[in-house]
Amino acid sequence: DLNLLLQKFPNDSLASQAQYKLVNIYKNWKFDPRKVLINLKLTTENYPNSIHSDRAQREIDAFPEWIINNAESLRKRKMNNKSINNLNYMIEKYPNHELSSKAQYIIGDIFMNDLRDFDNALIQYGLVIENYSESKEESLAQFMIGYIYANILNDFEKARLEYSKFISRFPNHELTPSVKFEVENLGKDINDIPALKHITS
């Protein structure tokens, strides 16, 4: 056990290596960003003149980016709950970081596309709008809320309301023409939409 080894021999020449090895265990086996950061900090504090300390400090400086990349890697491996846990840690630990809005949006995206849990997707996208106004993810989250109501839940009244918010808030957004088109044709059969009729004929 590396923790026991470090307690018994904190000044051993291999101690910094053992401490840094714990970082990689929590990174690659336990997927626990909180303990990764704790062990990175212990490496820099307890072994300040070691090569591992320099490496650990660089990782601390880039830690928010690492969390996002790690969460996306976990998602690709279908480890969705661990991915969400990493993203929630990012939001809690770095609430004002520029990547926190992205973390919140990815959580919504996981619920939407991977877990197909649309109620939770709506909640998570809503948190992007509530907590990260002016972020680039805000407009995408507002669009996705309208999209879920229109195309998945078939709640056209709520879809119209959410899409109207999008048009009002983001009149010059690249998605606005598509949103306007969708609002005009909410609930219509594809055969009743002249611009799309050729698709079924």
Question: What does each model-identified segment do?
Answer:
Residues 1-201:
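Acidic, polar-rich low-complexity tracts and alpha-helical solenoid repeat scaffolds
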